[in-house]
């Protein structure tokens, strides 16, 4: 499974030998849709991929985004949409032997009276090698932090779904066209898109799927990319139809000249 790693802090130099390093082997985004008052177990699979023992530390944080700033991890409970205090890990600190694997169970307890459409938090998993590198020679001194996002959707409250097109880049010598969206709603969504290109007679002369589906939390901006077609020069109408993982659809149109 291909993982998208949020590497928050990395310091490294060359080393002739391997050290301990704990990595997250499970997904980095967990979407939960349970009724208020219910519970859910989030399993976090960890593995020490190094040849020496390695410790890890789990820390709770809030999760937010402000368009181009990317993810932010403020202190737990500091944002309005926080569910950090719903989460409890069975352990927060542990040492794994070389190549040892472990599943840490994180319990989510959803309050009975919760009446918002969504909430979110983050588990920051930091790998801390047990032994310091030899100070006399080249060093490998790595501290990796993985951000495991926990995204809750309340099935009892209708969400506000609003994806705003911020920019469309179709010119230049780029091999792809890029459409930038911002999630202006109040719930996370995964979007996939299909682009249709119509000529001046209204005929569809090209259509393609977006290269990758994109997940967006509220206020986050993501770019959807399409392979650029090889078409004759002329006037065209581009129609992009997008769909969320919950089935909502929305579209964008744009006139362009090739």
Predicted regions and their residues:
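Surface-exposed binding patches on compact interaction domains or structured appendages
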Residues: 22-26, 51-105, 192-195, 199-204
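Beta-strand-rich interaction surfaces with strong enrichment in secreted/lumenal proteins
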Residues: 30-33, 90-96, 210-215, 227-229
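Short solvent-exposed strand-capping/beta-turn motif centered on an Asx-Ser/Thr pair
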Residues: 47-52, 63, 182-188, 245
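Beta-sheet-dominated interaction scaffolds and their linkers
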Residues: 19-54, 93-94, 161-178
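Short Pro-Gly-centered flexible turn/kink motifs
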Residues: 40-42, 94-107, 217-226
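Terminal connector regions
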Residues: 52-66, 109-152, 232-258
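Buried hydrophobic-core signal for structured, non-transmembrane domains
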Residues: 42-48, 99, 106-108, 121-125, ...
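N-terminal signal peptide c-region/cleavage motif recognized by signal peptidases
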Residues: 13-15
